[in-house]
Amino acid sequence: MGKKKKLSGAAKRKKKKEKEEAIAEAKADLERLKLGPTKLWTGLVTHHRDIFVSHVLSKLNKTDRMFFSKANTESLDLLEYAGFNVSKLGWSICQCTSVSTLEWAWINIDWGEKCDDGTLQDYAHFCSQVVRTNKLELLKWVREVKKCEWDKWTINFVTHVGNLEMLKYCFANGCPYDEQESCRNAARNGYLDCLRFLFNKIKPSRETEKDAAETAAQDGQLDILKYFVEERKISDAIKTECMLRSVFKGHLDCLKYMVEEAKAPLNDSQNISLARYYEHTECLHYLREKGCPEPTDEEYTDLANLYSANEEQHNSESEDN
């Protein structure tokens, strides 16, 4: 993945200053703790422990619980009482909800080390994880205050969370992007506003359009499918493939739309084969009502063997990964 970059003199001074500020803030927090527990802590946490556990702790994410554990010695006891394994407390960049918690993550991340999945913890990775907070103000902070680099994964994650304003910000500021992956993500997750923005902005290739349309059909995103049929005017060949993808996953609403509104040619017996093999009964009944041709016994057996082989290969690849 690459060697850890050596920090310049200016960068070292900046890191030193950040740590000094963090230490100063920690000392201030310690002084406040010397004043003793607040009325809120005593009243709610100490005297109404079960209410606090069921209505407060249960709402905290992993990172929130980690910060809570550092409040005082009682907080760890309370987490144990609530059933959390305090030896496995941790944090994630994507769960930071404010500039202050993100600043803490910036200071405490193991720069240059690898995550459990092998991803290098560099500036671009940090930026992409900030996107997962779904907060534009945090992305702006990490870019404009921390001058953090970004790469195609920033926009890939933007199209996972579906934040249009964040997407506009990325393009306005020259963020790299992967045309096919970003369009596929927006289609898969049903983010029509993001998908329309991408198609208007980057003018993707026909291959990308085909891939995104088929992804929408397979994932049951009817509004996205309508966009490709009614606004993008996809070809009959793509409509036919979208119909097959809808049947493959049992999306009856998408299948009906492709047949009744998109007027996709209903002349491929593979539709019946797919519905039979994957036991999508409603799709099967509908296809037969609409006069879809039936496969011969030999055709069905051949396709069933092909589907089975594909499943085995997919499962084998999943185990390897």
Positions of the model-derived regions?
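Ankyrin repeat (ANK) tandem alpha-helical domains that serve as protein-protein interaction scaffolds
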Residues: 2-321
